[in-house]
Amino acid sequence: MGAIKGKPLMKPHREKNGIIICLNVGSSSLKFSIYRSDSGALGEIGSGTVDSDETGPARLSFDYFQGRKPSIKQRSVSGSAVAALRELAASEDQIIAVGHRLVHGGLTIRDHLKLSPDVIAALRRATPFAPLHLPPSLDLIDECLDSFPGIPQVGCLDTTFHKDLPPLAATLPLPKQIRDIGLRRFGFHGLSCESVLKQLEKQPVRRLVVAHLGGGSSVTAITNGHSVDTSMSLTPMGGAIMSHRPGDLDPGILFYLLREKYYDLDALEDLLEHQAGVAGVSQTNGDMRDLQNASDRGDAYAKLALDMFVRSIAKQIAGMCVVLGGIDLLVFTGGVGEHATAVRERIVQMIESSLGSPSQMVLPSQENERIAFHTLNLIES
């Protein structure tokens, strides 16, 4: 099957007015933002989360901040999270679209696009590439189709920003018959990288490195606004060490664990998705704040895990500087990149010892703003 392509990106038309809901689903929570389109201009009304567990009802928290006194609205969600969101958004204005962040589009979907039955079927086939992320996203899409009948649903991919990686970066070191299946470096956190460029549009940077550090972490090299290399590869498991994922790992380790029957395939996948990374090394939950606190208390495993994470990110940044032939700006973003000051400072110290002192910035990852933009663009085009 050939690639399923979306329409070329363009400036949104000035016609559709109303509410766009942007959704970013996790394993136990749903992050969302609500935007209003007014004559082509997008403004965020607010953002929030719906947290749920097996012990009680879900809880919706929504922070209003557009043109109002800041206020937080909280409520228990007796029905579904989507039903609560529909009620909340509809109280603001007519809902005109729902935008979904999708981690992976598989071998055939490269662009942001409207979610048709054929597209959703292709996304279901793509779940082996992102088994942690895509199934809950697809469940949410199904629920939104039921809850918002007739309302356009749009999928915004984390891989689209990297779709034109040069062959030197995109090509995997595998035989041609395997590459011809469509296996390549896809790259991730593309919406985050794009949001960084949007925030820098008044001060363009020629050689930019973006370090998106969070539960998943990646480092991307950008030349004149275009991705030229990135640390994650075919799936979001590769590259730097992460909270629960190992990053790049010698495949021989996996062969050994399978051949010696320490793990079957499903258990091995669970190991690499949930039990590895800094959580595995430190024997903690993988939260960077807890890891830092444990390290400060003298926990040797926590210190080792933190040291490994810092060095892994620093090595990725240094490698991207080689790709770019230097660096004009290093941007930290993502939850850890924005808020873990001590970790960020240690990474900078390590790269300064060999790269000098590159200019640095800390910027928020505004993925939902990009989802709103692309969603409006697609329903107008």
Region spans (language model):
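Glycine-rich phosphate-binding loops at beta-strand->alpha-helix junctions
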Residues: D328-M350
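Short glycine-rich, Thr/Ser-proximal phosphate-binding strand/loop in the N-terminal lobe
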Residues: V25-S76, S233
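Glycine-rich phosphate-binding/hydrolytic loop that grips phosphoryl groups
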Residues: S357-S381
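Short beta-strand-loop/turn "lid" adjacent to the catalytic site in phosphate-handling enzymes
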Residues: L85-L134, I151-V154, T160-T171
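Conserved phosphate-binding catalytic cores of ATP/NTP-utilizing and phosphoryl-transfer enzymes
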Residues: K11-N17, P135-F148, H189-L208
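Glycine-rich phosphate-binding loop of actin/hexokinase-like ATP-binding domains
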Residues: F161-L258
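Adenine-nucleotide phosphate-binding core of ATP-dependent small-molecule kinases
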Residues: D270, G277-V281, M288-V323
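Oxyanion-binding "anion nests"
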Residues: D250-I253, L257-T284
